[in-house]
């Protein structure tokens, strides 16, 4: 319940900015993983704005194309990064080229697929808004949707494909880290939906914030790995499902879930037993009260 309360309050606070940036009226993203990166985006974006000359690095995905030509295209970046990963894995030339083409295809197709999602869901959102206005006397209601709606944004694609090899290399050499992200890399796109509304699509800011949050996330995953592994082993023992099986001598983790700031804070609070849970309960109630006061104030305007 604490996790849900944290997330719902954050999505209420961020909904207007999200809707204006993505041009998705009445829609918000309540997923904990996406919302947990918003505090980093707010803090670091303000720090960047305080650095003299940093504003000159205001390059979005379109600016990247103009500056680097065809090399700035997400499709070409996907091919290059995919081929480099294949080369680093010491694959043969055929597999290197196949991986490059596959990564490029992903970068090209994701925006097209998400555009279809948006076209299909917009009428539902509009009708729901009409129903809310009729039944709830015009009160403002945000409709929670999947972040898959917006992961096709060009800046998200560029930042994701660049950070995949970078975070793999960092994970190997990062002191104290015991987690190597592999399958979790598929969730890289979901890191950015709530970062972009604050960086305004600036590729440089987005890359730096993404890198910092991922590095911190590696430590979160390492810290939670023992209990994550225990839970997976218990599921495997009860169900026999090989998807939950972690081989002996290994620990499991998930960068696309366990690196969540909200999840880690709640995990640490629960580990403190009654004291931690009491603190979480107080914070949850306080956030509920503050959010209600904000909503009432907005409705009076």
What is each of the regions a protein language model found here?
Residues 9-17, 104-123, 210, 214, ...:
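Hydrophobic alpha-helical membrane-embedded segments
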Residues 57-66, 139-151, 164-177:
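Short juxtamembrane and helix-loop transition motifs at transmembrane-helix boundaries
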């Amino acid at each position: 319940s604490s996790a849900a309360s944290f997330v719902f309050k954050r999505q209420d606070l961020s909904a207007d900015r999200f809707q204006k940036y993505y041009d998705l009226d009445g829609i918000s993203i309540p997923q904990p993983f996406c919302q947990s990166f918003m505090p980093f985006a707010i803090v670091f974006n303000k720090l960047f704005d305080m650095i003299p000359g940093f504003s000159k690095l205001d390059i979005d995905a379109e600016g990247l194309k103009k500056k680097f030509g065809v090399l700035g295209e997400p499709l070409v970046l996907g091919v290059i990064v995919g081929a480099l990963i294949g080369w680093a894995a010491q694959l043969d030339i055929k597999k290197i080229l196949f991986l490059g083409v596959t990564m490029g295809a992903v970068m090209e197709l994701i925006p097209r697929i998400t555009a279809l999602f948006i076209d299909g869901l917009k009428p539902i959102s509009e009708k729901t808004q009409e129903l809310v206005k009729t039944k709830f006397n015009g009160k403002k209601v945000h409709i929670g949707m999947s972040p898959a709606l917006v992961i096709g944004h060009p800046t998200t694609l560029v930042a994701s494909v660049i950070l995949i090899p970078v975070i793999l290399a960092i994970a190997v050499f990062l002191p104290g880290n015991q987690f190597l992200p592999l399958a979790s890399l598929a969730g890289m796109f979901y890191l950015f939906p709530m970062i972009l509304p604050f960086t305004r699509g600036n590729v440089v800011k987005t890359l730096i914030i993404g890198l910092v949050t991922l590095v911190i996330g590696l430590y979160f995953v390492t810290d939670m790995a023992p209990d994550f592994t225990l839970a997976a082993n218990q599921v495997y023992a009860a169900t026999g499902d090989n998807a939950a099986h972690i081989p002996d001598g290994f620990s499991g983790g998930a960068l696309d879930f366990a690196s969540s700031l909200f999840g880690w804070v709640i995990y640490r609070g629960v580990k403190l037993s009654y004291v931690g849970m009491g603190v979480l309960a107080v914070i949850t109630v306080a956030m509920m009260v503050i959010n209600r006061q904000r909503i009432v104030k907005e409705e009076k305007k």
